[in-house]
């Protein structure tokens, strides 16, 4: 029973270990929420009606809209289709550095007065300059994707200098780092082919898919192990149908169905984003390059500003921590053009062997979990100073036993868009319930597959490795500043508390607390988006153990980490 308890415990702990910036192998922006999409036209015809028709045709071709999750492959396809128009001389895309509400996309189109009659088709076998695109015509797009990244990560006094009591019973541990300074190297490389083709032009129906293979490695003494590891495996492997058009009333509609291996993200990752695990035999623990869920089925329909979707998937967990979890869900969102989004979701877990352990010795299973979720996002006006606001709440129950867990957050701040460097400052309060042993109801929040990056739900570069969005109350003050183009600084100050003193289901060393104060952390992230191909990242954090930790673990020391990675992709 104890062994099963520890595996269930560390499944919860380990599933959330992530880094401070999404490192999805497809794109550094992959999965980011799209805040704004704008178009800039050069050399529009003087005839107003002709100019309007051309601009509308181009804008309707790029079918990534505000409040959607960014897909680099679909974006590349839409850009290639715009470039096929005979009246287009050149088209480029620029993606802003991420902010609190996601990314902004700017598409610049240069038109030609004389329509070019020459073929716009690309074929790498005839023209090597087409690379990485393999083949492109007015109906099809086939491209090669590649990414590679290496990281140096270091800690001073990891696990607050006390790895033995904090990691006792962890099945992944083999001589971990701890007291003193340690560093290690890890990396990954991914290669894949992705394509899409319009198979029924009359109804604008496209068949699309992709497959990729990834290798990863770790070398040195890291968070859990000093074993050098090298691993290779399939990452993406999916196929789908996508299409759309315009109703008789003039409303745009689109639909999408997909099956296979691919990452799934719900909203900004409050519930679901880390749909695969890294580390252990897969290596690359902190780079966190694997995201693809297994057996993902996703279907969505969007008309005008209303979107309805359904999904089913199995998270790609580590074999030693596999909980055999299956998640089904529906999601409904209603948004304005680009300012406001209202959403609601329902999740159901029909299958899982993950256990919940109670203070009285009872054991329950995640199987039967139901999650009800609502959210509201508000963006400031495009290009202007303004308020941003985000809030989300969720309630968990279980059809097999008495459960009632609750989580919510509220984030508000001000973005100074019209000021040099476009700084912003915001405050976020987040609460994830813990279990009250004096009631008959189980109340500890199940963190599911949250995470993402340091501006999403990785709450603290170091503290997140101790406490993973369950029985946790956090305060975050965050400032973002862009001192020069393509360079971004993210500064965070954190305070962490445990709402309940009973912490069974969290870190084993902190199962019973005598204080609510978990600690504090200050961190700084430097991001340099040199180009669409090159990205540089540095993160440092200093974490102070609070009385809830120091009273359970003797002789703790403050925890410092410093890491940097470079990434190349196309």
Labelled PLM ranges:
Residues 144-154, 207-215, 257-263, 308-314, ...:
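Transmembrane beta-barrel strands of outer-membrane/channel proteins
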Residues 19-185, 190-202, 425:
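N-terminal periplasmic/intermembrane-space "pro-region" immediately following the signal or transit peptide
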Residues 163-189, 195-255, 272, 399, ...:
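Surface-exposed loop and membrane-interface regions of Gram-negative outer-membrane beta-barrel proteins
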Residues 5-15:
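Sec-dependent N-terminal signal peptides
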Residues 557-570:
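Outer-membrane beta-barrel "beta-signal"
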Residues 156-163, 219-225, 269-276, 315-327, ...:
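Outer-membrane beta-barrel translocator domains and adjoining extracellular loop/strand segments
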Residues 125-135, 245-246, 250-255, 277-439, ...:
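Signature for the C-terminal beta-barrel architecture of outer-membrane proteins
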Residues 357, 392-394, 402-482, 486-493, ...:
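Extracellular/periplasmic loop regions
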């Amino acid at each position: 029973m104890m062994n099963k308890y520890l595996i269930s415990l560390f499944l919860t702990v380990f599933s959330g270990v992530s880094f401070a910036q999404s490192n999805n192998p497809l794109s550094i922006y992959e999965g980011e929420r799209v805040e704004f999409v704008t178009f800039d036209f050069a050399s529009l015809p003087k005839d107003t009606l002709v100019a309007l028709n051309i601009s509308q045709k181009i804008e309707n071709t790029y079918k990534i809209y505000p409040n959607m999750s960014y897909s680099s492959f679909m974006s590349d396809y839409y850009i290639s289709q715009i470039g096929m128009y005979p009246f287009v001389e050149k088209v480029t895309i620029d993606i802003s550095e991420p902010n609190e509400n996601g990314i902004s996309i700017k598409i610049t189109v240069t038109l030609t007065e004389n329509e070019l009659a020459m073929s716009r088709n690309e074929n790498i076998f005839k023209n090597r300059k087409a690379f990485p695109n393999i083949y492109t015509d007015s109906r099809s797009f086939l491209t090669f994707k590649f990414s590679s990244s290496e990281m140096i990560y270091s800690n001073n006094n990891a696990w607050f200098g006390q790895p033995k009591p904090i990691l006792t019973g962890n099945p992944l541990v083999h001589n971990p780092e701890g007291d003193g300074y340690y560093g290690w190297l890890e990396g990954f490389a991914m290669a894949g082919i992705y394509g899409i083709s319009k198979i029924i032009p009359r109804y604008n129906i496209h068949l699309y898919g992709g497959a990729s293979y990834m290798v990863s490695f770790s070398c040195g003494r890291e968070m859990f192990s000093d074993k050098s590891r090298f691993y290779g495996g399939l990452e993406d492997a999916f196929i789908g149908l996508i299409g759309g058009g315009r109703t008789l009333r003039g409303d745009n509609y689109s639909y999408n169905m997909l099956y296979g291996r691919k990452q799934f993200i719900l909203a900004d990752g409050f519930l679901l984003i880390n749909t695969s695990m890294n580390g252990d035999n897969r290596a690359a623990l902190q780079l966190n390059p694997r995201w693809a869920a297994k057996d993902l089925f996703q279907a969505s329909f969007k008309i005008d500003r209303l979107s309805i979707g359904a999904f089913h998937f199995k998270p790609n967990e580590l074999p030693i921590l596999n909980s055999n979890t299956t998640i089904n869900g529906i999601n409904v969102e209603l948004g304005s053009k680009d300012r406001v989004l209202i959403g609601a979701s329902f999740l159901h877990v029909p299958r899982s062997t993950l256990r919940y352990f109670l203070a009285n010795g009872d054991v329950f299973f995640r199987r039967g979990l139901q999650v009800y979720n609502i959210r509201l996002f508000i963006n400031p006006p495009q290009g202007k100073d303004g308020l941003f606001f985000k809030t989300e709440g969720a309630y968990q129950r279980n059809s097999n036993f008495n459960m009632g867990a609750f989580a919510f957050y509220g984030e508000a701040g001000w973005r100074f868009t019209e000021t040099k460097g476009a700084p912003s400052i915001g405050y976020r309060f987040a609460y994830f319930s813990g279990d009250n042993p004096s009631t008959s109801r189980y109340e500890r929040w199940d963190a599911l597959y949250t995470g993402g990056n340091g501006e999403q739900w990785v709450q603290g570069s170091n503290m997140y490795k101790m406490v993973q969005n369950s029985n946790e109350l956090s305060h975050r003050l965050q400032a973002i500043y862009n001192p020069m183009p393509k360079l971004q600084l993210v500064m965070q100050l954190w305070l962490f508390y445990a709402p309940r003193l009973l912490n069974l289901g969290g870190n084993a060393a902190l199962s019973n607390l005598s204080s609510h104060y978990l600690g504090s952390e200050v961190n700084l992230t430097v991001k340099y988006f040199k180009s669409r191909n090159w990205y540089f990242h540095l993160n440092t954090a200093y974490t102070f153990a609070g009385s809830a930790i120091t009273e359970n673990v003797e002789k703790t020391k403050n925890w410092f980490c410093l890491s940097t990675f470079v990434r190349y992709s196309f």
